[in-house]
A protein has these predicted regions:
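Alpha-helical solenoid repeat scaffolds of the TPR/TPR-like class and their adjacent stem/linker regions
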Residues: 1-179
Length: 179
């Protein structure tokens, strides 16, 4: 299966493909390849290159350098900041960051009553429900003027995977994902 996937990626890379919005047009992440029990680096790298070639706007910068706030503005983004092990695992990091130096914003995508998201929203300086559309979500995150954007997970679902291609803060990083 892995050899077929890698061969298919090489064939597709030679085609002249164009995507306007990979979240809508592809709508899937590559999370399940982590179960192949092999090194995913080259496959991930080739897939990312394919997406960037087919949709150059994915990698655009949507932020400027430091906005000049007195506190460092840190954002955490994940669809999993709800009753999920990812949300439970990283809630404490958001909750206990020193507020005298750091302004914390949490981003997720689903509205609705969720006790964990409600707790996270109370424990951070700002909580934002992002629209389930790639372009609008990018703009909304960039508009907050973050210094650092932290993805708690990348690849578990397609929207955060495709969001992670864009520069939405001067510093971007990812945590361990699914504990």
């Amino acid at each position: 299966a892995r050899r077929e996937l890698d061969d298919s990626l090489q064939k597709i890379a030679r085609l002249d493909c164009h995507l306007d919005d990979p979240y809508v047009e592809v709508g899937a992440s590559n999370f399940l390849i982590s179960y192949h029990d092999t090194n995913n680096r080259d496959t991930q790298k080739n897939l990312a290159a394919l997406y960037l070639k087919a949709c150059p706007s994915l990698g655009e910068a949507h932020c400027e350098e430091r906005y000049g706030y007195s506190r460092v503005r840190v954002g955490f983004v994940s669809r999993q900041l709800q009753l999920n092990s990812v949300g439970r695992c990283f809630h404490g990091i958001m909750r206990f960051m020193p507020r005298e130096n750091i302004h914390v914003t949490a981003f997720t995508f689903s509205k609705g009553s969720d006790p964990l998201w409600s707790a996270i929203a109370q424990d951070v300086d700002q909580s934002i429900i992002l629209p389930p559309r790639l372009g609008e979500a990018r703009k909304k995150i960039a508009k907050t003027g973050l210094d650092i954007l932290i993805y708690t997970d990348i690849g578990m679902e397609p929207l955060t995977y495709f969001l992670s291609f864009a520069r939405l803060a001067p510093v971007q990083c990812v945590l361990g994902g699914h504990p």
